[in-house]
């Protein structure tokens, strides 16, 4: 059986056990929809992110709640990009990078940088809501 590394990452904080937790599977190749849903249900966090290679962007990311897949999520995007930067999968040697992530709603930009103190900073922009 294939093994997958699952991280629990706290977004919006610089301290452990604070912020908003999210599951992140940084290399999800080979997982089926049913397996991703089972992992999200088992973790029982508000969202779990699964990262895949993409032909249209730097990464393809899918988000699952314990009950279903969702098209876009804020704090999981931040947790995912932080994780990919920490794993060295986002090159921050120039200090900052605009990363393109493919989601079911399209390709969206995320800005990732390494601050002078060494911490990773992630900024995402979303379209204005329509009511």
Where in this protein do the model-derived segments appear?
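Acidic, low-complexity central loop/insert segments
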Residues: 58, 64-131
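Generic N-terminal amphipathic, Lys/Arg-enriched alpha-helix
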Residues: 17-25
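Short Gly/Pro-enriched turn/cap motifs at secondary-structure boundaries
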Residues: 12, 40-42, 101
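Short beta-strand-to-turn element immediately C-terminal to the catalytic PLP-Schiff-base lysine
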Residues: 24-27, 51-52
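Anion-binding (especially nucleotide phosphate/pyrophosphate-binding) glycine-rich loop
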Residues: 35-70
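N-terminal, positively charged, Ser/Thr/Ala/Gly-biased leader segments
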Residues: 1-18
